[in-house]
Amino acid sequence: MKPDTLEFEELDRIRIRLIILGGVVILIFSLLASRLWYLQITEGQKYTEFSQGNRIRLVAEPALRGIIYDRNGVILAENRPAYQLQLIREDTPDLESTLGQVSQALNLPFAELNEKIKASHDLAQFKPIILVDDLEYEKAMYLETFQDDFPGVSIVVQPRRFYPKNNLAAHLIGYVGIVQEDWKELPEEKRSSSQIVGHSGIELLENDYMIGLDGGRQAEVDHMGREIQVLGKPVASVPGEDISLNLDIRLQKVATEAMQGESGAVIVMNPKTGEILAMASFPDFDPNLFSGGIDQKNWNRLLANPEHPLENKAIQGLYAPGSIFKVVTAYAGLAQGVITPQTERVCNGYYFIKGRSAPFKCWKEGGHGKVNLIDAIKGSCNVYFYNTGVGVGVDAIHKYANLFGLGKITGVGLQNEKAGLIPSSKWKKRIFKEPWYRGETPSAAIGQGYITTTPLQVINMINILANDGLWMPPSLFKDQQGLQPQQIPLKDEYLSLIREGMVAVVNSEGGTAKKVQFEEFTVAGKTATSQVISNKTLETLDDEAKASKIFQNHAWFVAFGPAEDPEISVLALVEHGGGGSKAAAPVV
């Protein structure tokens, strides 16, 4: 082959390669141009918004929660400034390093800070995470001074719930806490790690009114997350509504001091209006522990307490009412014609019933002798009411107990109020598939056996009795609207007889609460001692176990006065306090 021919062939191969290479280059540039067109034109608005999102921040202005007052304007729950240590992940290039710096500089446990981050994994990257809810002032000022060293971390002053009376009325007032577990159920724009809601008591019941409306502003921020300028017109937050209670914190304090550290409940009401003037449950707790999220140590301590400090025993505690229930049995006996005011029974200390070998005993060894209705109420004679209860039967007892408001919630509005239990023959057949036995009625007649009530139900019953059968619904709020008083179909003459017996309890010789009579006005009252275990079980215990406090009876006392025109009613329950006249009556 000639040399010229070889040169032409080589040039052709080079030319082909250049054409291919040029095509590839053109293809690449075409793809790049197409992508640039897509990014700048088709998706331009989207990425412009992304870019602006890196420098424009929506800064929330939390609404101030409504203040809770007592009936005299004393503040029970308010707001105070708290220095929140917040972190925005979007503004934190090296999260772990920043957390380490914060931990070291402010002497905060790294593990706890990291746990806060993990717990907020569902929160949007641009939303703040609260690392510390209420940082000490000195630490807050240090971080403010050296903020450049902590990218994405800032100090934000936020309102924090504060309870100036600490433990006083804690169960009634309730407490607030941070919402975290319900984030996924909220729209993205409403998710916030600082959302505060009521968790119990009035704080929960009135949460929708007290929470207010958050405001906010759009602000331009620098690369450190610091505000440069406000964009547009800020939206002001709207404070929540204030709440005024019927509670008198002075009475609440007196009730707390009177209990002297015992476990139980105290309630003070106005029977004419239904106003709750005091409601105390013991042991109590400090609601301030929950304002910024309770720590694990305090939470475990509250849960481990065998006396259940988080339970509002006034509405959630279920107890046999004991001898206070005798007012129901007395009314049932009068209404059913089983007894009259003059009916007398002989109490020799025990009562036999057919088919049962062991007698039902009276609390007074040797008995009360011959007693009529007034005497039986005054001395709390079990035998008199055993007879009366068996005479009317369990279903009549059930009927009149319901009329007095037992066996159903009072409707006070507080969460988890218990209804208690007033048994009937139908109830036992439904639950146990057994008939009601006559031998079960004596226990029911004196408020034992299956019967359980809450302290609020018991004082509600006494208010109906004191108020001539007019039921005033329990009222928590000052000037509360929508309450519907109800005249219960009870005969005045029977109610008057029972009130006479209750006056004798406090003011006559032989009365079970003679030691607590008042000089200022005449008081009507009733003591009660309710068993926590049966006599049969008690007999199986040794002396040391019998002496244990957990096996001691509960002590009740309820009173109203002045007896002829009641303006106040008081109930005291002392758990495992022993006799009502010894433990509960002195509280009142």
Language-model regions, residue ranges each:
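Periplasmic/cell-envelope proteins involved in peptidoglycan metabolism and beta-lactam response
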Residues: 1-296, 318, 338-340, 346, ...
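Beta-lactam-recognizing serine transpeptidase/beta-lactamase-like catalytic domain environment
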Residues: 2-8, 77, 221-232, 272-323, ...
